[in-house]
Amino acid sequence: MGMQEEDAKTIDGCATFFKGSKYILLDKQLINFGQTAVRRPDAKGQDDIYNRLWQKDHIAVVIFLENRQTGARFMVVNAHLYWDPAFKDVKLIQTAILMEEITKLSDNYAKWPPCTDKTAFRFSEAETGSEKAPVVEPAPSMEYSSGDQIPLLMCGDFNSSPGSAAYTLIASGRLIESHPDLEKRLYGNLSKVGMTHPFKLKSAYASIGELSFTNYTPDFKDILDYVWYSSNTLHVSALLGEVDKEYLRRVPGFPNFHFPSDHVALFAEFTIKGKRGKVVEADFGPQRH
């Protein structure tokens, strides 16, 4: 698995699209992992930050949305980490920085007051091309007691398999400073005291067993892409299944006419949990092991 020389010269980018008729964009933030790392007070004298991490241009995009109809607020994070298997430490530190920045943003968003004047946010429930529907007043904004109570979706190409340190940090909320993926390299406090985050994150596909792969080429197949969600605030209600196995027997790799990328699309549908009461768990049938 590698990158073409011309592609390597291109600055990395991520895009997050949302339905403007349904959601209000409250805030948007860009996280550049390399620039964020060198601005840390503990970066001074840490050569690995400058020699291995700072040169990488990978980013994450964070948006903070409010549902016009329900007033529920939530965060959506779209991230892309470094690809090279020889840089497991870089992927881990990018993940740690991502989780730190999301924590700061969510704590700040929890303090945001509700929108009082929603005249500009009135909406119509009519779909494009259908008969005109009456204009509806938006619901009152929901408030949250802490950042980890705000529903969170985090998706992207993490270039990390389920057994990696990056995956473990996201899924468990902590990672010791002596993890072998760090290779005893120095990244300030992140490599001195370990890494943590407060979110109860789960991979959406883990509820049925991770897919066999998300990246499929003739010489490389692995799980690199994920849709993470805060399990204390969100419930998985639907998932897009895996690629047909009979089709895969005839196709050695992607991209091709049917799959325009070597990464397959992941699709998940979520329901926001109420602050009280239980959500009935979806039945996805036999689990994949």
For the regions a protein language model found, what residue spans apply to each?
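Structured beta-strand-rich core segments of catalytic domains in phosphoester-bond hydrolases
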Residues: M1-D89, P198, V227, L240-E242, ...
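Short, glycine/charged-enriched secondary-structure capping and boundary segments
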Residues: N32, K91-L92, Y167-A171
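Metal-dependent phosphoester-hydrolase catalytic domains
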Residues: K22, Q55, F64, L105-H289
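Active-site-proximal segments of metal-dependent phosphoesterases and phosphodiesterases across multiple
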Residues: L81-E100, K118-V136
